[in-house]
């Protein structure tokens, strides 16, 4: 007769096979796992319930730890929406721009648009929620390369966000505008929809970040089509010098430094520092890597490994100090080697 450890190892093996198949951190009830495996994994802390019938892969001892949820958030949104709406859904224009800008912040409320959306809030874990808004889908939907969720194209999202977005989310808006290489896609969308007011906002936005060629092209072409386009700057702060980036991460770092440098520079000690105790100073550097490792622990979703299954099967898995210390030691060692 199989021992409890062997039964748990069997369930973990089934879970691992699911993860290996589609790299999923999300389980939808008994459609993917038998009730026996599901209950066993849930009881032992390997699955955490998000909604009735919906689970994310967790680990024992992670109860109350938000890391597992936030690292699984977009996987859950994708799996949940795909199950409810097939491919007929997309993140809101605002959240689409968050994804285009490389933002890693998880919104408290995830707004998705779907023709079959119910216009009601579904509460998720740790104060987050999803709001499926009933509405027409954009002309084109693309996959976010990082999370796989459905998003607006960059150009269509910029056109469709509200004017207040450029004030309330200035950094994201500027990053996304800076990634636009030419006016062709935006012009086609504006002209096809006769969007003269939005065209004026796009002209002002591109001129604000120094992309006068795109701004002039939109203005000239739309007026040539007979539209009464009036340029309006949607930003409140003074205009920028020319911003053009190929990577959202490059744009984010550059713009954040530009915004914060005046506050940071006075805090930097520029005076020459003479180190009398060289040995003590080097010892202090050796200690710093531990703090760096602690504050930089990975928040990737939890993956089941063959080694872990074998430890559980043999009864050697203990979600206590020993296993946690082993993990932290490996992480600290990796950061130490990088620190060198």
What does each model-found stretch correspond to?
Residues 1-5, 138-263, 274-283, 324, ...:
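Hydrophobic alpha-helical interaction segments
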Residues 2-88, 127:
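Short beta-edge/loop segments at beta->alpha junctions of small alpha/beta modules
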Residues 38, 50-53, 81-120:
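Short helix-loop-helix/strand-helix junction enriched in hydrophobic and basic residues
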Residues 42, 101, 163-167, 194, ...:
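Hydrophobic/aromatic-lined pockets within catalytic cores
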Residues 92-95, 101-113, 254, 266-285:
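Extended, Lys/Arg-enriched charged tracts that mediate electrostatic binding to polyanionic substrates
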Residues 96, 158, 293, 335:
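A residue-level signal for conserved active-site and pocket-lining positions in enzyme catalytic cores
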Residues 118-120, 125-128:
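Surface-facing alpha-helical segments and adjacent helix-coil boundary elements at the starts of domains
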Residues 226-235, 272, 279-283, 295-340:
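Active-site core of Fic-domain adenylyltransferases
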């Amino acid at each position: 007769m199989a021992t409890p450890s062997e039964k748990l190892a069997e369930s973990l093996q089934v879970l691992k096979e699911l993860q290996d198949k589609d790299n999923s951190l999300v389980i939808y009830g008994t459609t993917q796992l038998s009730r026996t495996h599901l209950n066993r994994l849930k009881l032992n802390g390997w699955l955490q319930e998000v909604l009735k019938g919906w689970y994310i892969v967790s680990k024992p001892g992670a109860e109350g730890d938000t890391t597992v949820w936030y690292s699984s958030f977009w996987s859950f949104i994708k799996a949940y929406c795909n199950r409810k709406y097939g491919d007929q859904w997309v993140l809101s224009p605002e959240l689409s721009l968050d994804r285009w800008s490389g933002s890693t912040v998880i919104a408290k409320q995830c707004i998705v648009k779907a023709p079959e959306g119910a216009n009601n809030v579904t509460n998720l874990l740790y104060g987050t929620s999803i709001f499926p808004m009933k509405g027409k889908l954009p002309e084109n939907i693309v996959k976010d390369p990082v999370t796989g969720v459905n998003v607006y194209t960059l150009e269509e999202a910029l056109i469709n966000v509200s004017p207040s977005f450029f004030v309330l989310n200035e950094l994201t808006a500027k990053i996304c505008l800076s990634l636009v290489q030419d006016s062709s896609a935006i012009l086609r969308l504006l002209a096809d929809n006769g969007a003269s007011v939005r065209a004026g906002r796009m002209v002002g936005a591109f001129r604000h970040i120094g992309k006068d060629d795109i701004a002039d092209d939109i203005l000239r072409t739309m007026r040539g089509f007979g539209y009464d386009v009036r340029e309006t700057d949607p930003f409140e702060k003074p205009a920028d010098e020319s911003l053009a980036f190929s990577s959202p991460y490059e744009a984010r770092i550059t713009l954040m430094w530009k915004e914060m440098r005046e506050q940071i520079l006075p805090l930097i000690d520029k005076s020459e520092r003479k180190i009398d105790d060289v040995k003590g100073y080097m010892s202090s550097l050796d200690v710093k890597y531990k703090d760096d490792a602690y504050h930089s622990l990975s928040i990737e979703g939890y993956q089941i490994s063959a080694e872990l299954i074998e430890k559980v099967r043999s009864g050697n898995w203990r979600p206590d100090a020993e296993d946690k210390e082993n993990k932290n030691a490996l992480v600290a060692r990796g950061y130490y080697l990088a620190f060198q």
